[in-house]
């Protein structure tokens, strides 16, 4: 099951951040994620989402970009430029899930 971290949609000009699950992230990280998503949508259109798979790998999913080739290049650029941030987010998501599981066991 994938856990959505954030998403943006160029058509509706909307940004979504999963505040319920990841709200404890620092505001500057939330802001950076918003910039990543909104700039992607502004540049190539369509939708973008950042989520974690079962092994806590950050997955970038895109849909319906106006420019398919530009979208692929933009995703590769994001992955390259934000590799350190994404690695830390993956570690954070894994630790957060482990803490949540421990809390559930205790209650």
Language model region names:
Residues 1-3, 98-107:
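Short acidic DE-rich linear segments
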Residues 40-95:
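Amphipathic protein-protein interaction modules
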Residues 5, 35, 75, 84, ...:
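Intrinsically disordered, low-complexity segments enriched in glycine/proline and serine/threonine
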Residues 1-43:
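Negatively charged, low-complexity tracts enriched in Asp/Glu with abundant Ser/Thr
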């Amino acid at each position: 099951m994938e856990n959505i971290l954030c998403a943006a949609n160029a058509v509706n000009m909307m940004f979504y951040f999963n505040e319920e699950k990841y709200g404890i992230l620092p505001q500057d990280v939330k802001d950076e994620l918003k910039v990543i998503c909104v700039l992607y949508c502004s540049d190539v259109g369509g939708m973008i989402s950042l989520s974690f798979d079962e092994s806590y790998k950050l997955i970038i999913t895109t849909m319906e970009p106006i420019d398919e080739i530009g979208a692929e290049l933009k995703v590769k650029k994001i992955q390259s430029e934000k590799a350190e941030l994404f690695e830390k987010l993956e570690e954070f998501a894994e630790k957060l899930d482990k803490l949540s599981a421990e809390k559930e066991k205790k209650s």
